[in-house]
């Protein structure tokens, strides 16, 4: 077999293996993220206590999804990148981080993995699936699109700047990405359910029979967010953002700020020396002025004697 053809088949094999693991990772991520949300709803339904307040639900849902992503992404970070999101995959395709074949395979894996994760949650719990992304009352489709666009752009940018960009903090990228998901949920879960991920919205919708008539919002908004986040990242790269703060991502201790106490002491000594020098200059100027005045008086006296004529 021709070496180039053999290399192509090797790449396809690797892409298929990575996509298979991305399927598992997506199902794993949504199993625990959606499972936590489902448990919260079931608890409110079964409990005789008053239901939890809205803010408690928002915090619980945000924590479930954010921490599930931290754990899942960290487990799969060195295997597939831990994307679990076709919108992230699309952004990486736009900036050259994914090749077209792997992008297509990853999208298929992420969508089917989301269906599998939602199906497992539904099969393991007795209550109807209550984890669908829906527009809350008072939230229009246009508002939903823009909310999803902006929060997806934030998530995309966190992935590109923390994981795609290589620097000292790259191994800890899953933490930053998970916290970004957590923060975006705090804002948007009350309005749109905070998908930021077309697969996360698609999986439960398939299992539940698409209860949200405006389901298209969770495709248009996140993919617009991918374009926005990737475009902003590309602009930063084009203008070489690292020149603005070149020593920020280094571990060289010599790039740290100087000893503040020594700097303060040096500054104080400089001011004292400047003050002493000004004082000396002032004294010298006064002495020169006195001498000049004395010389002028002597000159005037001599001139008076010279011009004096006896009568």
Swiss-Prot record:
Q: Which SUPFAM superfamilies match?
A: Aquaporin-like
GO MF annotation, one: water channel activity
Per the record, what ranges lie on the membrane's Cytoplasmic side?
Answer: 1-16, 78, 122-143, 190-215
Spans annotated as Disordered: 276-311
Residue ranges that the UniProt entry lists as topological domain Extracellular: 38-56, 100, 165-168, 237-311
State the UniProt keywords alphabetically.
Answer: Cell membrane, Glycoprotein, Membrane, Repeat, Transmembrane, Transmembrane helix, Transport
Q: How does it sit in the membrane?
A: Multi-pass membrane protein
Q: Which InterPro entries match?
A: Aquaporin-like (IPR023271), Aquaporin_transptr (IPR034294), MIP (IPR000425)
Q: Where are the transmembrane segments?
A: 17-37, 57-77, 79-99, 101-121, 144-164, 169-189, 216-236
What does it do?
Water channel required to facilitate the transport of water across membranes. Also mediates the transport nitric oxide, hydrogen peroxide and carbon dioxide across the membrane. Required for Hartig net development in trembling aspen trees. Contributes in fungal cellular processes during the basidiocarp formation.
Q: Know anything about its domains from the record?
A: Aquaporins contain two tandem repeats each containing three membrane-spanning domains and a pore-forming loop with the signature motif Asn-Pro-Ala (NPA). AQP1 has NPN/NSA motifs which is in accordance with the fungal aquaporins (NPx and NxA).
Question: What family does the Swiss-Prot or TrEMBL record give for this protein?
Answer: Belongs to the MIP/aquaporin (TC 1.A.8) family.
Question: Which named protein is this?
Answer: Aquaporin-1
Per the UniProt record, the source organism is: Laccaria bicolor
């Amino acid at each position: 077999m021709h070496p180039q053809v053999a290399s192509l088949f090797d790449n396809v094999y690797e892409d298929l293996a990575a996509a298979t693991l991305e399927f598992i990772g997506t199902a794993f991520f949504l199993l625990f993220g959606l499972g936590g949300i489902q448990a919260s709803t079931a608890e409110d339904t079964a409990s005789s206590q008053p239901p939890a307040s809205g803010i408690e639900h928002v915090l619980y849902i945000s924590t479930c999804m954010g921490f599930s992503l931290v754990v899942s992404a960290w487990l799969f970070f060195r295997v597939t990148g831990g994307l679990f999101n076709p919108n992230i995959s699309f952004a990486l395709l736009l900036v050259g981080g994914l090749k077209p074949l792997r992008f297509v395979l990853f999208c298929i894996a992420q969508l089917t993995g989301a269906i599998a994760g939602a199906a497992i949650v539904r099969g393991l719990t007795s209550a109807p699936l209550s984890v669908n992304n829906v527009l809350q009352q008072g939230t229009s489709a246009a508002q939903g699109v823009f909310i999803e666009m902006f929060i997806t752009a934030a998530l995309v940018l966190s992935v590109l700047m923390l994981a795609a960009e290589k620097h000292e903090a790259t191994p800890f990228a899953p933490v930053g990405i998970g916290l970004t998901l957590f923060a975006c949920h705090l804002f948007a879960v009350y309005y749109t359910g905070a998908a930021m991920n077309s697969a996360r919205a698609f999986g439960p919708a398939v299992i539940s029979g698409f209860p949200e008539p405006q389901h298209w919002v969770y495709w248009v908004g996140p993919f617009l967010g991918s374009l926005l986040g990737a475009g902003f990242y590309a602009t930063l790269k084009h203008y070489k953002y690292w020149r603005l703060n070149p020593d920020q991502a280094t571990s060289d201790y010599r790039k740290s700020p100087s000893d503040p106490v020594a700097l303060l002491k040096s500054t104080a000594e400089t001011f004292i020396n400047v003050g002493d020098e000004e004082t000396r200059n002032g004294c010298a100027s006064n002495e020169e002025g006195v001498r000049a005045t004395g010389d002028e008086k002597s000159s005037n006296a001599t001139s008076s004697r010279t011009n004096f004529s006896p009568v």
